[in-house]
Structure formats: C-alpha cells, structure tokens
Amino acid sequence: MSSPLDDKKNDLIASAGKSILGVVPFAGPLLAEIVDHLVPDQRVDRLTAYVKELESRLSSAEETIVRASLNKPEGLALAEDGYIAASRAVTRDRASYIASVVANGLSVEEMSESRQRYLLNLLSELNDEEVLWLRFFFNPVIDGDHEFRNKHEKIFEPARAYIGAPESEIEKASIQESYKEHLERLGLVESKIQFDRKTGVPEFDKFSGKPRTSYTDITHLGRMLLREIGMIEAEPANK
C-alpha cells in the first residue's frame, strides 16, 4: 500500500506531465528521478505551486520549440535546475520567478538555455528582499513607481546609521547597505560616487568611512534578470 508521501510524489509527477515534461517521452522518468532522489520529502509540497505556474506559462507554447529545447542537454538541464530550485523556494513569488526563467528558456526559440541557467543561478544568489531592491533600483527616483513602493514600504523605508543612532536602526541600515553591495558585486546595479564640487575629491561617509554615492542605477544585466523573472515588461524593439 502506498504512503501519503508516495501518493503526493506520484500526483506531482502526473501534474508535471501535463506541462512541459509531458512533451518528451523520456522526460517523465527524469522528473520521477528528480522528485524521488534529488528533492527532500518535506519539500514535495513546494513544487506544487511551481508546477502549476510552469504549466500556466507553457500552456500557449509551441510544442515543436519545447520539444527541440528538451532534446538538447542544456534544455533538460534547465528543466532539472528549475525543479531543484523550486524545491527550495519558500514563497509563491520565488516559484513564479523560477517558472518564468525556465518557461522562457524552453519556449522561446531564440532564447539560449545556457543563458537561462546562468540567470537562474544568479537568482539563487538573491533572497526575496534583494530581488525587491533590484526592482526598486529599476526606477530609483523619489516619485517613481508609487504602487510598487507602497506595497513594500516597510522594506524600502530608508535606515540611517549615524553616531548615537539606536542599535536597531544601525542594524537595519547595515542590512540595506549589504543588500546594495551584494547586488553590485553580482553586477546587477552600479553606484555613482559622489564628488565634492569644489575639490573634485570623492566624499566619504563619516560613520562607515566608505565613499558616498549620489545614486544607484540598475545595469543591463539587472534589467535582463528582472525581465526574465517577470518583474518588468520586455522593452519594445527599436523600429
């Protein structure tokens, strides 16, 4: 007699079979292996939202393109990477981001699966708050993107570390600065150093000792990642 957990796994495999992995006959056994051996038991439920999201995104995909993608090693690797990443996702937003990257890689003919795997790995380097901050820097002006900023105002509320500031404020400022520095290290944003107008020398923060920045802007790679996870629309092609 099968256990409830085995039933969940079988249901998950069957559900996924209705989406992209059902296109290629040998993809079903591949998913079964991923679920049975690579995904811890307690994470099976996390894949449900991902499978539904992937199925939704691929429902209008052209089967011949998907079949061609999955017939390539990189395409199968992308599908596998997606399921493994989704098994670690703890929010629906994260599952949606992953599904968007994978679906684009498998269903868009001119899309490189290797590129999508790179972006998926890049996404795995960020926590959910860092993703929101990356989206924040897409439109960094004070009066820009009110709806998005209001929705996440607790995250974006600026913290200031100054001499005599409460410990909680210093900690929050440290986290925010760490997020920005991490995005910079990954090449997703770049900060413009603030210079003294009279001397032309960079200005330094008295508290941290680091150069002050006038503003932080998103890079092309940052825009690409946001576009592929579905947080911004694709830019219209030049006419």
Predicted region positions:
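Short leucine-rich amphipathic alpha-helices used at interfaces
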Residues: 5-7, 12-13, 50, 57, ...
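Amphipathic, membrane-active segments
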Residues: 37-81
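Membrane-inserting effector segments that mediate pore formation, membrane fusion
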Residues: 2-53
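Alpha-helical membrane-embedding segments
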Residues: 71-85, 152-159
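Long, helix-rich, hydrophobic modules that act as membrane-proximal anchors or helical bundle/coiled-coil regulators
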Residues: 99-239
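Non-transmembrane, amphipathic alpha-helical segments
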Residues: 5, 12, 16-19, 39, ...
